[in-house]
Amino acid sequence: MAATDSPAGDGAAGLRRLLLSGLVIPAHPLALDAARRLDERRQRALTRYYLAAGAGGLAVGVHTTQFAIRDPAVGLFRPVLELAAEEVRRAGRRVALIGGICGPTRQAAAEAALLRDLGYDAGLLSLAGHSGDDDDLLAHCRGLAEIVPVVGFYLQPAVGGRDLSHAFWRAFMEIPNVVAVKVAPFDRYRTLDVVRALALSGRDDVALYTGNDDSIVADLAGLFEVEGRRLRFAGGLLGHWAVDTRAAVALLDRCRPGGMDERLAIDAVAVTDMNAAYFDAAHRFKGCIAGLHEVLRRQGLLAGIWCLDEAEGLSPGQAAQIDRVRRARPDLCDDDFVAASRDAWLSG
């Protein structure tokens, strides 16, 4: 598929408008069978679920998809990108299709070129593992932005990210082909570094997306004022939204008017509590992927919680925590929605 044949259509300007409009963008999991091979039927069913739930974008080949798909012995990076793109084209509506980019510059450039060739709209650029200084990182980012539009990614150090200075983000905002930033340092001070950098850049064509799983609603309902400029997070690009996506769409709609009323404040705490269970915060996120798989397994979208790494699974007590949070807030869950259409998604 040519780069001009993006599943989302209408080029860079349309992508910027779409991202700024505010989207729920789930990070796409990987569906495996008991032999830890790709389960194409269930992989497609997941994509169909997200699109039916009202997601405005998809992030594929990212942490939730498992970085090991890039291992030549696994060989799943291109196949999972292709499956998602095919389902988006079948859906026939405007969706922001974002693929993960990681690794040293040579690897990252090859991944960016693949995204471009498959018609992806943008690359989510992980800087995890890079040890260079700000100048080295910025050169890396500029080179990739010449290949594909870039979504910056501030990843928390606890899961492989690194601290990045306000000065880095201020310079990053000057890269013309930056279309958005996923802000996920799990740190209010560092979150403000990114917001300030965007405000001071003067740009109004870069969207802020939260990845702060510990403060999703606070980010989405918040209003930031920096030297006379007011900014908001447009939406979220979240592994958390790989489950209960329809409920996430409704939640984002409630956050759009701005301001945290009492009901939204209560729900903000509930969402964080749910995230702690799914992402296994009690064990430093060891079971974060398996926790999402467990929810999808219970709903019948996945056959099991298998990960490429056989050592990955639920932590002790994590299943009970998932029971607790879903029992407490069924209104924030998609169980009925999934049950009504699951068989169609699996057979379509």
Where do the PLM segments sit?
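Catalytic alpha/beta core domains of metabolic enzymes, predominantly
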Residues: 156-288
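Alpha-helical structural signal in soluble globular domains
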Residues: 79, 83-91, 114-118, 143-147, ...
